[in-house]
Each structure stands twice: as structure tokens, then as C-alpha cells.
Amino acid sequence: MSDERIRQIAFYGKGGIGKSTTSQNTLAAMAEMGKRILIVGCDPKADSTRLILHCKAQTTVLHLAAEKGAVEDLELEEVVINGFRNIRCVESGGPEPGVGCAGRGIITAINFLEENGAYQDLDFVSYDVLGDVVCGGFAMPIREGKAQEIYIVTSGEMMAMFAANNISRGILKYAHSGGVRLGGLICNSRKTDREWDLISELARRISTQMIHFVPRDNIVQHAELRRMTVNEYAPDSNQANEYRTLATKIIDNEFMAVPTPLEMDELEELLIEFGILESDEQVKQLTETDKAAKESEKKQEDAEGEA
């Protein structure tokens, strides 16, 4: 199979939103349908493959390279581990917080995988990426034209929506140079008021779709405690069928958009309209977070310009 036919997708979302859980359950469902999948974990926590491999955390490329002396000394079989339904799994890894560039592991891992033929005979490559904003090394799958379809995991909570809007801003930045597109928002429900309507409206306003609404179900946590996906732990459950539905929607998805992220006042208006943003303190929190995010993006742009 040629590289041109491989669909390269990425899951982004606010920390703690359930991005890795949602992506692994969805990819497990896709594998059940016969799709050949490689997961590339792009989070220093190395938790992007644990439900597929039934382990606490897969040993990362950077850790293995440090043990061997250099990434060039590694064999592909040491890095890529097969899990549930023969899903191939890799964790890029990263340094301790505050020490070095966490995105460097992503760059190192992807280059190693490409050079050693890891992308052969695949239908999907999935990048599970840390970050409330798309910047630095964490933008690498987008910036370098690796991931072509982005799915943002969000919910009806204020900061999750703020992060989704920020991520769409990052996608827009690279849309014309790298060809990346937003495939849709995945609402990982937190059972907030009018959540379905709110995320559907957010999706409409940023020119995308809510590709699926994943209901909240305790069976997800029960499966996680056993380090399993719901599809493996309870294959006949309603929740497993929800992930199968989402998997089918992604497989069939042809709605790839260049997003139109909201300005801060537009996002505030939406949140006020749905009763999410009520107090002056909440408005202040959102404004300060937006300012910090933009300052972070500006610093990264300056650093990229100097590189």
C-alpha cells in the first residue's frame, strides 16, 4: 500500500478531556472493522496506547534511544508493539516537565518510523497529541504535513470549548501551507446543560461539524481500570456501539474544513447565550487564559523564525 492512500489523522484536546481514552476506543472499533492502524502517541505521559496494550505505559522511543545510545541504534521491532486487533503502537515520549522540548520526541519518533518503513501496509496512522493549543513540537504532525485530518475532543465545559477554539486557530495557521483540515468536533459528554446543542452550535460557528456525541457511561472507567478498551471489555454494550458509530463516521468522513475560529468576544457571546458564562470572574478567567495562550503562540512563532 502506498503512503498516499494512508489516512493520517490526529486527536487533539484539552488536558483531561478524555482524548486518549476516546481515541483508543474509537481506533479499537476501527480495527474491529478490519482497518490496519498505527497509533503514534505524542504525549510525554505515554498513555496513548495503554488500553490497546493492556499496560501502564509503553516504553517510549526516547527512553529506548537513551538506553541504546542513539535512536539510530534501535530496531523497529523494539519500538512498535502490536496490541488489540493487531493495532501497532508507538509512544514518542518526552523529557521531564520543564526540561527541554517535549515536542522533540515527536519529531524523533516520526522520523525514525518513516525511515524504517513503519508506515507500510496501513489504512490509518493516528497521532494522539498533547496540547490545549497547537504550537511548538506538538504542532509537528500538522506543521510537517503528517496529519491531514484533525479531530478535536471537547465537551460543554467552558475551558474545553476554549481549548477547541484555540486548536482550530492553530489548524487554520497551517491549513494553507500543509493542507491540514478539521474533520470535526467529538463531544465527550460531561453531562452539562444543553451540551449537544452547545457543541453543535460551536461546530457550526467555526465551520465544522460535531461528528459524534459520545454519552457519558461508567463502563468506560470500568474498562480503563482493567487497562482495556470498552470494545474489548464489554463488546455488546451500548457504549461500545457508540465508539463503533464514531469509528464509522470517521472512516466515511468527507467533510474536511478550514476552520473559522471565533474571536474572544464571539466565544464569550456563545457561552453567555447558553448560560455557561455567567459571572464576571468567569469572563476574567477566560480573557486571561486567552491572553496567555496568544503570548505562548507568539513566543513559539519567534522561536521558529530564529531556527
Swiss-Prot record:
Residue positions annotated to bind [4Fe-4S] cluster are: 101, 135
Q: What is its EC number?
A: 1.18.6.1
Obligatory cofactor(s):
[4Fe-4S] cluster
Q: Which UniProt keywords apply?
A: 4Fe-4S, ADP-ribosylation, ATP-binding, Iron, Iron-sulfur, Metal-binding, Nitrogen fixation, Nucleotide-binding, Oxidoreductase
Q: What class of enzyme is it?
A: oxidoreductase
Tell me the lineage of the source organism: Bacteria, Bacillati, Cyanobacteriota, Cyanophyceae, Nostocales
Q: What PANTHER family would the database entry show? A: LIGHT-INDEPENDENT PROTOCHLOROPHYLLIDE REDUCTASE IRON-SULFUR ATP-BINDING PROTEIN
Q: Where is this region: Disordered?
A: 285-307
Per its UniProt record, what Gene3D superfamilies does this chain match? Answer: P-loop containing nucleotide triphosphate hydrolases
Q: List the InterPro entries.
A: NifH/chlL_CS (IPR030655), NifH/frxC (IPR000392), Nitrogenase_Fe_NifH (IPR005977), P-loop_NTPase (IPR027417)
Q: Organism, per UniProt?
A: Mastigocladus laminosus
Q: What name does this protein carry? A: Nitrogenase iron protein 2
- Cited NCBIfam families: nifH (TIGR01287)
Kindly state what the record says about how the cofactor is bound. Answer: Binds 1 [4Fe-4S] cluster per dimer.
Enumerate the Gene Ontology biological process terms. nitrogen fixation
